[in-house]
Amino acid sequence: MLDKEAIKELLSSRFSNDIHTKLSEIPLPCELKDTFKAAKRIKEAIQNDELIAVVGDYDVDGIVSTAIMAEFLTDMSANFIIKIPNRFKDGYGLNEDIVKELDHATLIITVDNGISANEAALICKQKGIDLIITDHHMPPPILPQAYAIINPKQANCPFPNIEICGAQVAWYLIGALKEVCELRNYDMAKFLDLLTLAIIADMMELRDLNRILVRLGLARINSSKRACFEAIKNYYNKEKFEFDDISFLIAPLINSAGRIDDATISYEFLRSRNLKEANGYLDKICEFNASRKAQEKALFESSQNDIDENEDIIVTWGNEWHEGVIGIVASRLAKKYKKPAIVFSIDGERAKGSARSVGKFDILSLIASQESLLCGYGGHKGAAGIVIESANLNKFKTAINQSCFLQELYDFSTNDEILGQINPEAIDYELIEILEFFEPYGQKNPRPLFELKGAMVKSAKRIGKEESHLKIILQKD
């Protein structure tokens, strides 16, 4: 039976290896390879009034990365444009067509993408465009030929072994620019509200520097003067947002524009100058979110028709399934079946897939083992994107399950963590304060679960707009 001191000790032990626990202690920009080389080139471009193009991504991390870089460049009165690729028209990240579209720029900066853009980098070189890549995805064996590459995962980068998102990499570049441009009073903390959206949405580990940034960022969101947050507070009729609100309400909302239409609308929403402008963009985003929910529900149901529950890896596909929601469906399948899931949308001779993992299982490495069958892939240990010839789908499904079976050890266990058994009398305001002290909960700091023995359900009632929550009153046996 756990007492409160034991609960404190168990939760404290999760952070025993954390080094950076204060904002003043977090790693410096100089610890990211090429950061100051990139900053000096950007400073030169600003001073010479060169046209700078910022190329982002269509998820929350990419949208936020673009927004904070745009805010800094605006503060510097720089000459710049932004391009967030359209999922359906442009595809993912910097590519040849986007370089051609931006060939009037002399400097291109990627945020949350670019580490695999080898062909696009060559075209930049041919056109005399300097390319600065900022990314956090796993680098390929051969890096693009860029002017500078800022990625904590690249070789010979002294940055600590902590998973950070694309917006954080962009934020660190701005930190280097602050030094290079001698902006002593420039407020780097003003980006923490937006940064927190990206860290939570991209499911970064909530330990070490990520933990302190999110704790401070949540406070910033709740006191933020940005029109976008004021509009969101009004929409949800909430004055205070917590981690779960960001994760389950705000992040999916902002993501929906890129999933259904164009992520640039969410970028403009985050950059809104006043409440009227923010409300206009929010109305559009809410329509996209409603459409996303409807399509997600339909696809989730149809995706389960051909699932073999005996296989280690769920692989399913369909003709012209909506590309914007297959990632969410993969997440839901992984959660339901407690095993990794890959969902493909077939469009003629090619299929695009989205993979989601569970527990500590490295889905990206497993996908990489089937590289000979793929047209392309990329991502993280927990999530990945795939492009494959439609004719190879059955081969891929068989091969990836065989590859998983041959691995002697694999961990599909989820992050749900039952700390132990507690006495009902221990559930009081003091316990709530203890649990609140160790917030925010998320990756690597799962919300603690407790076991009650001998408790009976006295009443149960569905609550909420969609009756998706259950209010239970328990009675001691």
What would you call each of these model-derived segments?
Residues 2-107, 127, 178-398, 409-417, ...:
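Hydrophobic helix-and-loop "lid/oligomerization" segment in the mid-to-C-terminal part
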Residues 68-167:
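Hydrophobic, small-residue-rich alpha-helical packing segments that form membrane-like cores
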Residues 136-137, 152, 322, 380, ...:
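Histidine-centered active-site/metal-ligand motif
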Residues 143-182, 188-201, 208-210:
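Short alpha-helices
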Residues 223-226, 406-477:
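A contiguous loop/helix-start segment that scaffolds small-molecule binding in enzyme catalytic cores
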Residues 403:
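Helical lid/core segments from catalytic subdomains that handle acyl or acyl-like groups
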